[in-house]
């Protein structure tokens, strides 16, 4: 875990930590699952989610088959299994977060930003009390942490709940893990 101490800019984002490891091992209430809109959970975090939560996969597949999974609009799935309770005895929630239209395509940072705004606007209404989120679009999506990190920090910093950001497995320069870097304004959507 990487926490930021003794930084004057840290006033608003004290609830965010950067984590190495497996997002599914968190004790946080809500886990973000990166998905596409084609109904396929074939690689990465999505495949792990399919194996761990087959009921969530069926729900997600049904949404895709009915054309109800859209870029920029995450969907909350309330897990109803006793095996995945959080420390406060609430059931896990899974937030299905589209990062790609089709599994063959790269991740879309414009839609990721729209989805993050949706999350900021709706997390209270959805009852999200703590959030574990991977580096959206990094890994199989082909995006770079240097672009995604500041974007995540910008939006998740607006949420008044504990947030764990799970870092991608790629080597990240140490300067891209600093508070100073993460507080920089992310690239404008028009830059893509």
Predicted regions and their residues:
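Macrodomain-like recognition of ADP-ribose-binding/processing modules
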Residues: 1-192
């Amino acid at each position: 875990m990487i926490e930021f101490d003794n930084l004057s800019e840290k006033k608003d984002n004290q609830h965010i930590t950067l984590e190495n490891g497996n997002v599914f091992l968190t004790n946080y209430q809500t886990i973000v699952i990166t998905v596409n809109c084609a109904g396929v959970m074939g690689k990465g975090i999505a495949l792990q989610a399919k194996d761990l939560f087959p009921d969530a996969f069926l729900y997600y597949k049904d949404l895709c088959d009915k054309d109800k999974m859209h870029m920029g609009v995450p969907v909350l799935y309330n897990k109803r299994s006793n095996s995945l309770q959080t420390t406060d005895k609430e059931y896990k929630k899974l937030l299905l977060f589209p990062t790609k239209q089709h599994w063959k395509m790269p991740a879309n940072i414009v839609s990721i930003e729209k989805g993050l705004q949706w999350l900021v606007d709706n997390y209270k209404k959805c009852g999200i009390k703590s959030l574990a989120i991977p580096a959206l679009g990094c890994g199989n999506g082909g995006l770079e942490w240097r672009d995604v990190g500041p974007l995540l920090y910008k939006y998740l910093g607006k949420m008044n709940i504990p947030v764990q950001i799970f870092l991608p497995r790629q080597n990240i320069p140490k300067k891209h893990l600093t508070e100073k870097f993460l507080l920089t304004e992310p690239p404008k959507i028009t830059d893509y």
